[in-house]
Design a protein with these regions (language model features):
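N-terminus-biased targeting/localization segments
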Residues: 1-71
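Exposed acidic/polar residues on beta-strands and adjacent loops within beta-sheet cores, strongest
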Residues: 37, 199, 242-245, 254, ...
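Core segments of small alpha/beta cavity-forming domains
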Residues: 40-121, 190-249
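Surface-exposed, charged secondary-structure patches
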Residues: 83, 88-164, 248-310
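Contiguous hydrophobic, core-forming segments of folded domains
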Residues: 138-211
Length: 310
């Protein structure tokens, strides 16, 4: 299973690569609606039935992936395949993963529905842009799941799935280019601890900030502000170090806001502002980072800095 490695991005760059993830096997299209003369795959996800494309948006979502049977026939076929495998001593989840992991059962993987849930709600139906990426979905179905498991899905949101696609489930289809699968504890442990903060104090501070970002209202990772937040949560360690510093100064995290940067021109750049309020004096300190969300893969433009209200 892939383990996340957060990187220190001291210089703004678009080339930061998660050490746990391999590169996408296909190019990413533009996120805008296309004219009739444009290529068929640019700016739109393919319809589930192979019909016309529809305007779509980028997705950078945090949640959990689960596999479901779209029909009784697929479920029965899976049961027969399970009977051919050596699954003695395994629980149902482990046996499920064993069957899916075998190359000869890849035809079953293609038949399954892979649903992404966010905060317990069914949010997206996942399909790979490249068929080779079905392996990423199999890796996300862990043999020994934990409540702290987390999946990051990066792709493009298309139309709502027809009811016959996944046993009546009608949620937007996301054609993904990359999936990271890890657990929250591994993410926190991969963050270098600030010199003046003990590991005992740092871990709870980082966990609280991460949970606050995850639990923000309606964060399905499809809006630009949520994509920027989710990107920072899993790819930029400085926000956790800064949170630990403020907590050590007896301050509370009171808000996380996003706004369009005045630096936006041809590119769409958002400012993510973190507000901390001192518990004794009620003095508010703010810091922010700029994130470019123009294309499918967000990237850091300005590292974390003090923020002053205009």
């Amino acid at each position: 299973m892939e383990q996340p490695v957060l990187e220190v991005q001291e210089q703004p760059a678009s080339t930061a690569v998660n050490a746990a993830a391999r590169p996408s096997s296909s190019a990413a299209p533009a996120a805008t609606a296309v004219s009739p003369q444009a290529c068929a795959s640019c700016g739109a996800a393919p319809a589930a039935n192979g019909g016309p494309t529809t305007p779509s948006s980028w997705v950078y979502a945090l949640g959990n992936i689960e596999a479901r049977f779209p029909s009784v026939s697929v479920e029965k076929e899976f049961a027969q395949a399970t009977g051919r495998e050596k699954t003695a001593g395994q629980n149902d989840r482990q046996a499920f993963h064993t069957v899916l992991s075998k190359p000869e059962n890849r035809y079953l993987v293609r038949q399954l529905c892979f649903v992404m849930t966010i905060e317990g709600l069914e949010t997206y139906l996942l399909r790979p842009r490249d068929p080779a990426d079905f392996s990423l979905l199999v890796e996300a179905i862990r043999p020994n799941p934990s409540p702290l498991d987390l999946d990051v899905v990066i792709g493009i949101k298309g139309p709502v799935a027809p009811p016959e696609m996944c046993n009546g489930l009608m949620v937007p289809i996301v054609v993904f280019d990359q999936i990271y699968s890890f657990d929250r504890d591994a993410l926190i442990k991969s963050i270098p601890k600030p010199e003046k903060t003990s590991a005992k104090d740092f871990a709870p501070a980082a966990e609280e900030l991460f949970d606050r970002i995850q639990q923000m209202t309606d964060n399905a990772g499809a809006m630009d502000e949520h994509r920027a937040l989710n990107y920072l949560a899993v790819r930029y360690q400085a926000i956790y170090s800064k949170a630990a510093e403020y907590f050590a100064q007896n301050s509370s995290l009171t808000s996380v806001n996003t706004q369009i940067s005045t630096l936006s021109g041809m590119r769409k750049i958002l400012e993510v502002v973190f507000s901390y309020t001192n518990r004794n004096t009620d003095v508010v300190d703010k810091c922010f980072a700029r994130v470019d969300v123009t294309d499918e893969f967000p990237f850091l433009v300005t590292k974390l800095s003090p923020y002053y209200d205009r």
